[in-house]
Amino acid sequence: MKKALKKSLYTAVLSTVMAMSITGYALAAEDFDDAEDMEFTLDSMVVTASRIPTKITDAKADISVITRKDIEQMHISSVEEALRTVPGVQFLNYGGNGGMNANMSGLRINGSKEIVVLVDGVRVNEFQGSDSGYFYAALTNNMDNVERVEVLRGSAGTLYGSGAKGGVINIITRKVNETKTSIDVSSGNFSTREYKLNTMGRQGKLGYNVYYDDKHSGDFKDGSGIEWKSDIDSTSAGLKLNYDITDNHKLTLSYDKTKAEFSGYDYIYHNNYSGHHDSYSLTFKDDITLSDKWSNSFTYRRSSTEGEYAQNNHSLFNADLSYTYDFISDQVTYLTNRHNVVFGVDYAAGKDDDAKEFTAHSGKYEHFKMKNTSYYVQDDWEIIPHVTLSGGLRHDRPSNSGQTGASIETHTSKSYKLSWDVTKKDNIYAGRSGFFILPSIYQITNKQYGNASLKPAFGRTSTIGYSRSFDDYNIFTFNWFETKTERGIGLTAAGYVNTKGLSRGWNAQFMTQLGEHWNANLGWSHLYQYEDEDTYSMGYSPKNLATFAVYYDYAKVKAGLDGYYFVRRVNDDYPDGWPVDNYAIFNMSASYAPTKNISIYAKANNIFDKMYSERTHVIYASGKPGDWYSMPGRSFVLGMQVNF
């Protein structure tokens, strides 16, 4: 069974990390130019909760924000690094093994790997199903181009479609309203080096943004001093053009490409591995404001992904995959004093470029393709002053072709929520939201583990929330949730099967400004989770996860300290499955700006050199203590950024 799961996981990584798609509505973030503006206050806007710009205190949702200031304070280099201190977010990473990791590896929100990732409101994962929470996209590598990252916890299936069970991550890029070029060079231990270029400018109605990132890392040591062989070279590049036809009519064209090559040694299977994964996406958007009440957003995206993973002596683990996707979305927004209405249609089509004709144990396939058309509507209605009733519907009509087997059923997801502004500072809400998850192309067509009869997953999440705004700079939120998976998708030795599951827990966070130069974010998440027939999940869930971040900013000096404390929910069947069940990770960063245009920085990750792991092989029959993929130990980076 372990080989079956391992093989499927290797292939799923390549098939899902690079899946890219869309969802219609995108809003550019406000551009912040000075330190005072970068502070996140109650007046700051978020868009992910309702697809409409809303103050964070009016969102009535379990949401967190990583701001531009947070990114700069900690010199955060990737979206994964930014998300590791967000309440309710978990990663299952293969240490520094490049062929088994992605930009965001094994990502979970509220215990679920079924999430939606957006860039400027546009999906970058589609037809992923319930694979492994892996995402691969160029824009997740270069944080110089990112204004903020919004994390919405909880099911959002009616607004964002298939896959939005655990939550939604929206990466919002910087708006082009100035001319600026940034060059960043850094180097550290583990043969780490990175070169980044980001340039933007505006000439009249035309704005542009170009970015390039080149990154290398080599062998690394874990917290116990053991060296792991690894070599990773990756590049990401992109171009975004904005053209303002009028103040109310804007066009955007963007192209993003990423390429990675990797090799190393798998100490669990005692074998060399090598491979690559490449992807690109081309996106066109047309946003128009028709009046003070009506607006429309149209999006088209084409993306292509290709990858290969190979182990020298284990052909069972080899994978060679290539997918192409097309996406069209149109959303209409209607706003009045008492109603915020969004409605629209999303269309997605994907095909397996390598699957010309073959017979798997689950069926016969020829030029396999998947399609899905979704129609949705949501209304936030202030029924009386301070009381809002929200309701939404999404109808999915999926289909596939080139398959001898069961057809995929249609589904309608529903959501509703009632919120009450008890006082000017206190808000409570309660609601329920359904989700619907299509199987991925890989889960259906894989020659060894695919299942032609695999049905979509569906279920619902119930939530109760409370928020307290002490003042403009101090916010507390608490959210309880329960997710019932009436039909899920799990992996066994025999292949993919439909399952059932339950997760329940809560998230709490406190965001505060400590005087003129300090600010902090604190979080605490608690989780119970169970899913039958999914042996892969055993022992991976956290029982409690505490997160923290403290930042200091004064004159030419910036500094930050962040991290998390992980308490594992131990599986009694595998008491020795991990090097440690409870651990704390601390990271720190400091920078000094001798001039306005130059910044010299240093950062240290895992500063106490903690030995820990997020992936284990011990739970399998042949596993033994020590058969886990260790995370890197203490690492250092020294860099310089020049702006002109």
Q: What is the meaning of each model-derived region?
A:
Residues 382-390, 476-484, 497-574, 599, ...:
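Gram-negative outer-membrane beta-barrel transporters
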Residues 259-261, 306, 351-356, 399-411, ...:
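Surface-exposed extracellular loop regions of Gram-negative outer-membrane beta-barrel proteins
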Residues 139-182:
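A beta-strand signature from Gram-negative outer-membrane beta-barrel systems
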Residues 170, 178, 186, 198-277:
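Periplasmic-side early beta-strands and strand-to-turn transitions of outer-membrane beta-barrels
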Residues 7-11, 23, 27-28, 43-45, ...:
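Conserved C-terminal beta-signal and adjacent last beta-strands/turns
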Residues 55, 80, 84-123:
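Extracytoplasmic beta-strand/coil segments of soluble accessory domains associated
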